[in-house]
């Protein structure tokens, strides 16, 4: 009874009203044993609970919640008075009436949970060793704080909110920062309200950068199947897969009615146009360009010319005008080069029609008496990339001999890749290609229409290698074996055999008739 009487006297001396008390069950022996025993390793919850004092002012979360819900006003005044008196008694160093105060009040408190006076009273930090989830699950988590507004200036609800906010902020800091503003800021910028946030100019910078990127991309060359423009309109009517190249050879025809000009486009292994072979001569002027020229290329892509309503439309118009100007320059360049080389072109016939997948598509257009090969080298320039063409006229050698054999031995090795019947000549024309790797020499062999015994061989190009090693040993052996037959004695024996064979046949016939 004396102890119960001392407690109210202490509270009366401090002038604070009485506070509600809860009777706690005694601790079991095992808990006391683990708390005070030697040689045992306590669990994590025991360690956390030992870090906080065991006085009545620092109870479990459920007890604090029950006390706050029962009488918040009374508990607030009592807790404030008790806390002030405890700090005063600890500061004076007196232990006369400190039965309710644990001397481990400040010694066992972890340094990570200490709140500095220089910081804001509503903020605290979580130590690195403890996660917010572990701290919330601890039964003595809110023992550091008063159940109501105390010396720390926050309730346990506010403490929970602070811990949750810090956990969310820590997770947000671990994620990579995005370069785009929140949707709310972008929406406020696009709505055009009077109050614009601080980060509102960021979408405007993004829009300007997008304009610059798109304009730069519009100047880059595109590697498409269509070759560089030469001032004329072409229609693709066939293609063929060439041995040794991943890209097929494309065949084009001029779209102008009555124009017989055709061309072939060959590409290298990397997809670049390496050779354009024209066939025939245009019988019309180059078509006029209907698109806008350089005079209309006055689109301004500055910030003053782009607004929120017409930014995309002006951007599309500027791209169209830029592409038109680049194409106009290329067409002018190609028209000049085409005009200087048209005198080397000859007329073409309509004897060749090539379709997709047909097997009669040959390596070369057959009705081409004087072809013109154009090797292209693509160079990228800074303002507007264009293809600079280099015209190469390969030498042609025509050899006419009288022979019964079409293919004459000239020392090189050839591979036949095509054959075609030419209009006006009943004899077919055969096409051959040099088998040496890297050599582009071709030849076609045909008999003259006026003299069937005359063989006309036309060579195109120049060999870039020496003569291959001829099979002289085999030819010499064959010639040596044939030399005895050429002697007069050999001819006499051959004549005798020829004379005897008809007699034998006559005898067989006579035997069959009898």
UniProtKB/Swiss-Prot annotation:
Any one Gene Ontology BP term: response to ethylene
Pfam families: WRKY
Compositional bias (Polar residues): 185-198, 286-299, 315-326
UniProt-annotated location(s): Nucleus
Binding-site list for Zn(2+): 434, 436, 439, 463, 465
Entry keyword set: DNA-binding, Metal-binding, Nucleus, Plant defense, Repeat, Transcription, Transcription regulation, Zinc
Coiled coil: none
GO cellular component: nucleus
InterPro entries linked to this entry: WRKY_dom (IPR003657), WRKY_dom_sf (IPR036576), WRKY_plant (IPR044810)
Tissues where this protein is expressed: In young, mature and senescent leaves.
Region Disordered: start-end pairs: 1-28, 175-204, 278-394, 464-514
PROSITE patterns for the chain: WRKY
DNA-binding region extent: 223-287, 403-468
Low complexity composition-biased segments: 300-313, 469-480
Predominant subcellular localization, coarse grouping: nucleus
Residue stretches of biased makeup (Basic and acidic residues): 359-380
Observed effect of gene inactivation: Increased sensitivity to the necrotrophic fungal pathogen Botrytis cinerea.
Single annotated GO MF: DNA binding
Keyword Zinc: yes
Domain of life from the UniProt record: Eukaryota
Induction of the gene: By biotic and abiotic stresses such as pathogen infection (e.g. Botrytis cinerea and Pseudomonas syringae), salicylic acid (SA), jasmonic acid (JA), ethylene (ACC), liquid infiltration or spraying, and strongly during leaf senescence.
Main function: Transcription factor that binds specifically to the W box (5'-(T)TGAC[CT]-3'), a frequently occurring elicitor-responsive cis-acting element. Has a positive role in resistance to necrotrophic pathogens (e.g. Botrytis cinerea), but a negative effect on plant resistance to biotrophic pathogens (e.g. Pseudomonas syringae).
Protein name: Probable WRKY transcription factor 4
Taxonomic source organism: Arabidopsis thaliana (Mouse-ear cress)
Taxonomic path: Eukaryota, Viridiplantae, Streptophyta, Embryophyta, Tracheophyta
